[in-house]
Amino acid sequence: MVMTDPIADMLTRIRNANLVRHEKLELPASMLKKEIADILKREGFIRDYEFIEDNKQGVIRIFLKYGPSNERVITGLKRISKPGLRVYAKSTELPRVLGGLGIALVSTSKGVLTDKEARQQQVGGEVLAYVW
């Protein structure tokens, strides 16, 4: 089966694993997914991730993060720009997620950045998803 939206698949796998409080999850690797996982780790939404090489495209293993009393760190993930309806924003029009408590993942000419980083570097791009 051909996957039409690998980013939505990644977000759905994270959301589902988070809902049942799994410690880790695995998904097919790509450079874009690796950049997204890197941002999620840097912003403190996941504990860690690792790239596992195989003879095909590889696998990304994501280790989810929970609070001291097992509460979820990721409360929501929402795909914004979809294959059927792309959403682009200038650096001055980038959205703030929950008043700055969440992040927007933006695909720019300088790679995947958070909304805050894109605003600082004054680059716009495709708004991939919101994470809070």
From Swiss-Prot:
Pfam families: Ribosomal_S8
Gene3D superfamilies per UniProt: 3.30.1370.30, 3.30.1490.10
Protein origin, superkingdom: Bacteria
Gene Ontology terms: biological process: translation
Keywords assigned: Ribonucleoprotein, Ribosomal protein, RNA-binding, rRNA-binding
Gene Ontology molecular function, alphabetical: rRNA binding; structural constituent of ribosome
Gene Ontology cellular-component annotations: ribonucleoprotein complex; ribosome
Annotated SUPFAM superfamilies: Ribosomal protein S8
Keyword Repeat: no
InterPro entries (UniProt xref): Ribosomal_uS8, Ribosomal_uS8_CS, Ribosomal_uS8_sf
Subunit structure: Part of the 30S ribosomal subunit. Contacts proteins S5 and S12.
PANTHER family for this protein: 40S RIBOSOMAL PROTEIN S15A
Protein family per UniProt: Belongs to the universal ribosomal protein uS8 family.
Function noted in UniProt: One of the primary rRNA binding proteins, it binds directly to 16S rRNA central domain where it helps coordinate assembly of the platform of the 30S subunit.
Entry protein name: Small ribosomal subunit protein uS8
Species in which this protein is naturally found: Shouchella clausii (strain KSM-K16)
Gene name in the database record: rpsH
